[in-house]
A protein has these predicted regions:
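Classical protein tyrosine phosphatase
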Residues: 446
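Alpha-helical transmembrane segments and immediately membrane-proximal extracytoplasmic
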Residues: 2-441, 449-566
């Protein structure tokens, strides 16, 4: 029987590599969105900055691996054979679930997926054990960390409301103060904005960067004999004040003397920070389970006991993750970032929803999106009636969109939004995640970054009268997908754990089935990409002739009428 668990371990290692690929493909949107959307940095520069952030974040993520070992279930209640079944069920489910979201181009939370997969598989195994012992359903609480699921669900709701609201408010104020003609403002204006943004991002990088390192809990005489983590958390006000002054002076020097674009620096630093946070936090979602399985296997083989007699209390102890594994994971993640086409598909979804210009909308409007748009429109009209005309005219002038987003320029050269919105996206996301880290709140980086981007899009008037119902419908679809992730992850992992428990042969069947689905999704995705390229080339070829222009204009008019019918 020892061979079956060795084979399971080998399978888990292979699944870990695949999970890294599908996981990075989905989570890349969190840190690439702002840089790619603003188009102020070259694609190569963006990828290099993000790659460095990911690699450093991976090395710093050792402390986060405890989540897969004891964060969701109580390992001492399970035997080695049961733990291995739970881990197999989790990894198979995770790959299929994330690949599905990648294929349809929808962002989701890898944290929520892994948490609810662990929860579903461990609940299923607990119920099997309870049934065999003739226990009661209430005994499940002895096996499961029930408070964790509640925290995650509350985290989803909190992320959606808070991130969206704060993003919208900060963007509205930023646009009101800076307008779209921010380049004509005095140097000190850009310096103050740069100082605030870089301070937020620096604190964010420090909070997220040191959290998983071995230095986080070490004390140093230089900072009064306290740990770095405690120093950062207990001296927030002083750190922010001093850093803001320093960063504002540096920003002024960059603008005035070195003629640097401070917004490029903000976007580069923000991209690095979010990439570092993603790798540091989310690496556990991809390799935490296989590493826990490997450590369980080592402890079991050393014990000399039968698999169904060896309790897994060993997982409750803290065991450091070998750095070589973290480095290897970092290499896989960086390679995936550079070569994954599905990552670009997920990024496109978020960029389309936040685009300042007119695009071909992907999502169809529904009664809920129409209702929300009407409510927002009526509220805006009421606000306009209350305010004096002079104030309204001043606001309109500040929010007047430049030709960059409206004139007919090549689609590939047109930015989705400007550097002010990109900077606000990164700054607000960094602040919210830093606060969540400080107070140990279970906020997902995916939820925060996505909802901040949607909030800034709303207040920046990217959702016009003709596109609002489409964009709101898209946001609602993504949010529904988040809740669907939790439900599907819990149910599927529990079902797979039950099937594997019936017979270990089901592992081979399930892995074969998973491979078939992955190949099918890959082929399907490739066909969609190819068809898109062919269709685009045909439109360009037609537009070069007079008749082609007439046909294209007719299509646009038909689309406009159809869109008007859907809106009203």
């Amino acid at each position: 029987m020892e061979n079956i668990y060795l084979l399971m371990l080998v399978a888990l290692v292979a699944l870990a590599v695949a999970d890294l690929v599908v996981g990075v493909s989905n989570d890349a949107v969190n840190f690439l969105n702002s840089a790619l959307g603003s188009k102020v940095l070259s694609f190569r520069t963006i990828m290099i900055v993000a790659s460095i952030g990911i690699f450093i974040g991976c090395v710093f993520s050792s402390g986060m691996m405890e989540v897969a070992r004891k964060g969701i279930f109580n390992p001492g209640e399970f035997m080695f054979n049961e733990i291995m079944i739970i881990f197999m069920a989790v990894m198979i489910t995770d790959i299929l679930l994330l690949d599905f979201f990648n294929t349809v181009g929808m962002p989701t939370s890898t944290t929520v997926s892994i948490v609810f997969e662990l929860l579903g598989a461990s609940v299923a195994m607990a119920l099997i054990k309870i049934g065999m012992d003739n226990g009661s359903f209430s005994d499940v609480v002895n096996y499961i960390n029930t408070s964790k699921a509640t925290q995650i669900i509350l985290g989803i709701l909190l992320s959606v409301v808070v991130a969206f609201s704060i993003g919208a408010i900060v963007q509205w104020i930023s646009r009101l103060l800076l307008s779209y003609n921010f380049e004509t403002k005095p140097s000190w204006v850009g310096a103050v904005f740069g100082g605030i943004a870089l301070t937020a991002l620096t604190y964010f990088i420090l909070m997220k960067g040191i959290k998983g390192t071995s230095y986080a809990k070490e004390s140093f005489d230089l900072i009064g004999g306290v740990t770095i983590k405690d120093f950062l958390e207990n001296n927030v006000f002083q750190i922010v004040i001093y850093t803001s002054a320093l960063m504002s002076l540096l920003s002024y020097a960059f603008i005035q003397f070195f003629k640097f674009d401070i917004y490029k620096i903000i976007i580069a630093v923000g991209t690095f920070g979010l990439a570092l946070a993603f790798a540091g936090n989310d690496l556990v979602n991809f390799i935490g389970v296989p590493i826990a399985a490997w450590q369980s296997y080592e402890a079991w083989t050393a014990s000399g006991l039968a698999a169904n007699e060896f309790g897994m209390g060993v997982l409750a102890t803290k065991v450091p993750t070998p750095n070589i594994l973290l480095v290897c994971a970092g290499v896989v993640m960086v390679l995936t970032l550079w070569f994954s086409k599905k990552a670009k598909r997920v990024v496109k979804t978020e960029l389309d929803l936040s685009n300042q210009g007119n695009i071909e909308e992907r999502f169809e409007p529904n009664f809920l999106s129409r209702g929300l748009v009407r409510l927002a429109t009526n509220s805006s009209n009421l606000f306009s009636k209350i305010m004096p005309d002079s104030v309204n005219n001043k606001i309109e002038e500040r929010f007047r969109v430049p030709e960059t987003f409206t004139k007919a320029i090549a689609k590939e050269d047109r930015p989705s939004f400007d550097v002010i919105r990109a900077s606000v996206n990164l700054m607000v996301a960094g602040i919210l995640i830093s606060i969540a880290t400080s107070y140990k709140l279970p906020l997902s980086t995916t939820y925060v970054t996505f909802m901040v981007a949607m909030g800034t899009s709303l207040s920046d008037r990217a959702w016009g009268s003709d596109s609002a119902v489409y964009r709101v419908a898209g946001v609602l679809n993504v949010i529904a997908g988040w809740f669907g992730t939790a439900l599907i992850a819990f149910t599927a992992a529990g079902t797979i754990a039950y099937l594997i428990n019936i017979s270990e042969l089901m592992i081979a069947v399930l892995i074969f089935f998973a491979i078939l689905l992955l190949v099918r999704n890959y082929i399907k995705g490739k066909k969609v990409t190819t068809n898109g390229v062919i269709e685009e080339s045909l439109v360009i070829a037609e537009s070069s002739s007079l008749q082609g222009v007439i046909h294209e204009s007719a299509k646009n008019i038909a689309k406009l009428i159809k869109r008007g019918n859907k809106i009203y």
